[in-house]
Swiss-Prot record:
Species, as recorded: Dictyostelium discoideum
Protein family (similarity comment): Belongs to the MAK16 family.
Protein name (record): Protein MAK16 homolog
Cellular localisation: Nucleus, Nucleolus
Disulfide bonds: none
Biased composition (Acidic residues): 195-227, 235-270, 299-309
Gene: mak16l
Region annotated Disordered, chain positions: 194-309
GO biological process: maturation of 5.8S rRNA; maturation of LSU-rRNA; ribosomal large subunit biogenesis
């Protein structure tokens, strides 16, 4: 015959494998404990009549222990599946614990409420989107990058080969060596020619637009200068040459005979040729200086060779 008082005295005063203490409070680790507190009322070992609720894979079960099954440990706990509906499960607990103590049925209901609450939270968390950390393989990334580069190079090669073959067909290097019908080749060549003409027309249009813009800018600059009261003055090169010739005519000319009279001792020596270099003078405009002017400088070098007779 089981004696609850003797069992509790042994467990309370001596060792119990399920008993733990935290902050001077005793707790029970037994899976059938209703409250989790280590005391005589909540201890599943020291009570011959006991009931609790357990959750297994999201399903709640009601466990009951009676004195009649104390001699069969494998059949000690009666297992009853509770309905997933909360109200129906409460009715099941009330019906099975109708003649049990009130505090026992109340604690079982409290435990069932806590279990249903954390099951609801678990369902909500499963529905939420979670971030997964995926490991990145550097070797695989490098391999993919090299493959992409090779594919790009191959694509460029194919386009260049295509252009080269079309150019050779246009030039007629293959003549009648190809195995394709002439209609297809002519169509391809016509399409390529149209594309080239279109590109050439676009280039010509761009050049014409650029020339027109340059002319417009030049005309705008001229208009601005005329508005400011200035004028262009160009200096021609022919007039400069005439002026330089006049200067040389006005300068006195020394003859080789006069030099021989001055130097009496050097009669037998030959007179070396003299090379005269003169830089042409720069002419400044007489009119008022405009804002923009064109300056031209002319340099003329003349060599005169005079030999003594």
């Amino acid at each position: 015959m089981q004696s609850d008082d003797i069992i509790w005295d042994v467990i309370n005063k001596n060792f119990c494998s399920f008993k733990t203490t935290f902050n001077k409070t005793k707790f029970c680790k037994n899976e059938y404990n209703v409250t989790g507190v280590c005391n005589k009322v909540s201890c599943p070992l020291a009570n011959s009549r006991y009931a609790t609720v357990r959750e297994e894979e999201g399903v709640c079960y009601l466990y009951m222990k009676t004195v009649e099954r104390a001699h069969t440990p494998n059949r000690l706990w009666e297992k009853i599946k509770l309905d997933p509906n909360f109200m129906k499960a409460i009715e099941q607990i009330d019906s099975h614990l109708e003649f049990w103590p009130g505090h026992m049925s109340h604690r079982v209901k409290q435990r069932y409420i806590r279990i249903t609450q954390y099951l609801i939270r678990m369902r909500k968390m499963r529905k939420q989107i979670k971030r997964e950390l995926v490991p990145i393989k550097k070797k695989a990334e490098r391999r993919d990058a090299t493959r992409e580069n090779k594919a790009l190079i191959a694509a460029h090669l194919t386009t260049n080969i295509k252009k080269e073959l079309l150019e050779r067909l246009n030039k007629g290097t293959y003549a009648d060596m190809h195995y394709f019908p002439e209609d297809i080749i002519n169509n391809v060549l016509e399409k390529e020619g149209e594309a080239d003409q279109f590109s050439e027309e676009e280039a010509d249009e761009n050049e014409e637009e650029g020339e027109e813009e340059m002319e417009e800018e030049f005309e705008d600059d001229i208009d601005d200068i005329e508005d400011a009261g200035g004028a262009f003055e160009y200096v021609e090169g022919d007039d400069d040459e005439d002026d330089i010739d006049d200067e040389y005519e006005n300068e006195p000319y020394q003859d080789d005979d006069e030099e021989d009279d001055d130097d009496d001792d050097d009669d037998d020596e030959e007179v070396k040729p003299q090379i005269t270099k003169k830089r042409g003078p720069t002419f400044k405009p007489t009119k008022k200086t405009p804002q923009k002017r064109v300056h031209m400088e002319v340099e003329i070098e003349e060599e005169t060779e005079n030999q003594a007779n």
